[in-house]
């Protein structure tokens, strides 16, 4: 099986975006932008990160709703 050369980069990028999206010291705008970027990545791994954000009760309802919307968009693209 061939290994995807970009995989370590994507995984690191997902971790960074997830960290930003959950960092309550950041502005809401920055957290929302991180969620949007996760949606743009559109991979299965990004979908899982977004679903983890949806389940995170430390985020406010609007941020969780945005993560759910972006996750839904990824699922729709996969059809």
Where in the sequence are the language-model features?
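Buried hydrophobic core positions in alpha-solenoid tandem helical repeats
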Residues: 14-18, 49-51
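Short linear motifs at secondary-structure transitions and domain/linker junctions
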Residues: 14, 25-29
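Structural detector for internal amphipathic alpha-helices that build alpha-solenoid repeat scaffolds
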Residues: 1-10, 19, 29-43, 61-77
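Alpha-helical propensity feature that highlights long, continuous alpha-helices across diverse contexts
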Residues: 35, 51-54
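Short, charge-rich amphipathic alpha-helical segments embedded
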Residues: 43-49
């Amino acid at each position: 099986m061939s290994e995807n050369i970009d995989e370590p980069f994507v995984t690191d990028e997902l971790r960074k975006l997830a960290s930003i999206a959950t960092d309550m010291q950041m502005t809401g705008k920055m957290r929302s932008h991180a969620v949007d970027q996760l949606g743009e990545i559109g991979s299965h791994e990004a979908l899982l990160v977004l679903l983890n954000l949806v389940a995170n009760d430390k985020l406010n309802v609007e941020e969780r709703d945005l993560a759910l919307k972006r996750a839904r968009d990824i699922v729709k693209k996969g059809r």
